[in-house]
């Protein structure tokens, strides 16, 4: 469920309907994922899931799997 929603957000932010993020996907794997796109993606994630990330969390995940785990923890609290 989280992964599907992240894919929907990524497709919108990166304007690529064929984009599929996996748990091992990193920013470097996605064409156009630069610092500005990262900010747009993360703000969109915060809005979609109704969560807020700390500064460290905002930039501290290695791959989509890390982001998914972080979101799951936030949604449980």
PLM segments and residue spans:
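Phosphopantetheine-dependent thiolation modules in NRPS/PKS and related acyl-activating systems
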Residues: 1-32, 37-77
């Amino acid at each position: 469920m989280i992964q599907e929603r992240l894919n929907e957000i990524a497709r919108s932010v990166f304007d690529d309907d064929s984009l599929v993020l996996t748990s091992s996907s990193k920013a470097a794997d996605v064409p156009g994922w630069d610092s500005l796109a990262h900010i747009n993606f993360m703000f969109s994630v915060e809005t979609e899931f109704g969560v807020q990330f700390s500064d460290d969390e905002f930039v501290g995940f290695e791959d989509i799997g890390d982001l998914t785990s972080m979101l799951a923890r936030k949604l449980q609290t």
